[in-house]
Amino acid sequence: SYEFLKPYVNHIAFISEGNHETEIKRRRDVDILSWLIRLLNDSGGNVIKGRYSGWNEFVFYYKKGMDKRSILTHYHHGYGGNAKRSKGMLDSQIATFQYPDADIIFRGHDHQKFHDPSNVRYRYNKAHKTVKTCASHYIKTGSYKDGLGSGTSGWEVQKGFMPTKLGGWFIDFEYRKISDVGGLDITIREAV
């Protein structure tokens, strides 16, 4: 994992626990994620370790701290199996209603990869007594693991899983003085 992630060390803000990491920690009392993050940080990174689920706030300053905007994200490693028809798309709306303050929602676990920006919600500003609509980005983080290969053997083949799109995501934030997203434009693009 270290050799794979090392070229991207300056682009990784945080890495969270997954079911494999928590099982190794539970059964062997070894925190392999802390080891990985220490290696990345020793290579010039500033990676923070996250738990299985949680929140991150990214704060952006404009003109030497005179003005700032933030993006709130909710992450959860994920759960469940390989939904053959929906590929987990139904969870997108449920998560948006469950975490209405999150600008971006990250989910993983089942190795599906997609981005759904279609969930729009109303946000009420008590201080200004105004209502606005905001998009919530739902990101299934994907994986670089091809568990099916040629489809002849392996755990995923035995369980009848469908092929998944490989790769991850890059998220670019651009601070603009005028924008519909609170001064920040979000661009989400595939990392393959």
Feature map (PLM): residue ranges:
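Extended recognition/assembly regions associated with phosphoester-bond processing machinery
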Residues: 1-192
